[in-house]
Amino acid sequence: NNETTIPVISLSMPYENWFGEEEGFYNKIREEISHRVHVEYFDSTYNEYFYVNSKVKLGGNWSLGYPQRTLNLNFNKDENGNKNEKVKAHVFGERMMLGNSNQRLTDLTRFRLHNGGNCFEERTGFNDAILQNLMYGTNASTTAYRPCIAYLNGEYWGLYSIREHYSDTYFEDNYGVDKDNVALYELKGKITFDDGNDFESKEFMKRIDNFLKNDFSNDQIYQSFIDKVLIEPENAKHKMII
């Protein structure tokens, strides 16, 4: 019965999955551990509500050791591996699709509850979200953000950020690209495959490695890289400048 001006998300699963000695998120800091969690969402007016059973994994790097853990929620499939219908909700308010400025971002299959990352210790918790919002409208892909209140098994767990998660479905939700045609790579010391369809990763990495051995001050080599790897120069410029 408490009033709130921001959305509320409630997460429920067995106590052992949160705090157990074997696979509890608050005892074992391992990204590969996953559980099933019941998620309930209420907007600030209580006019919009949904619930879904979701896969949940820990996210983050250094921030994995903080009292609030980043939680990656994926409800694309049920516990039997069957595909779920997308959740239709205005979780990100008035945010529009990046690939279609006339359509609001409403169809969801995953998002993350973000603890603020590296700025958690400074007690701000929204530095990254502010940067993403400043980037919105440029040619760089950004993730939507909305603050929320979180409850774990009915216990108040503080302020979190609801964030889009870079994934195969992110590009499907924002740009209309079939997720089966998406391969997402991540740079953590080295480039590794992260999500999507790994059908051409070895060939892709081979092409990248070969190109990076060249001298890009040569106009012909630079243009060949743009044409063959299909990088859009304006997008790359915006990303690097920001």
Stretch-by-stretch model annotation:
Residues 1-59:
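Regulatory N- and C-terminal appendages and interdomain linkers associated
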Residues 2-5, 67, 82, 106-109, ...:
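Extracytoplasmic low-complexity repetitive segments enriched in small/polar residues
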Residues 5-6, 108-109, 139-143, 155, ...:
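Loop/turn elements at helix/coil->beta-strand transitions in domains of secreted/extracellular proteins
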Residues 31, 126-127, 140-144, 233-237:
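Short, glycine/acidic-rich beta->alpha junctions
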Residues 34-36, 40-100, 144-195:
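Carboxylate/His-rich catalytic cores and anion/metal-binding grooves
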Residues 88-110, 114-118, 123-124, 161-242:
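ATP-dependent phospho-/nucleotidyl transfer catalytic cores
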Residues 120-140:
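A conserved alpha-helical element in kinase catalytic cores
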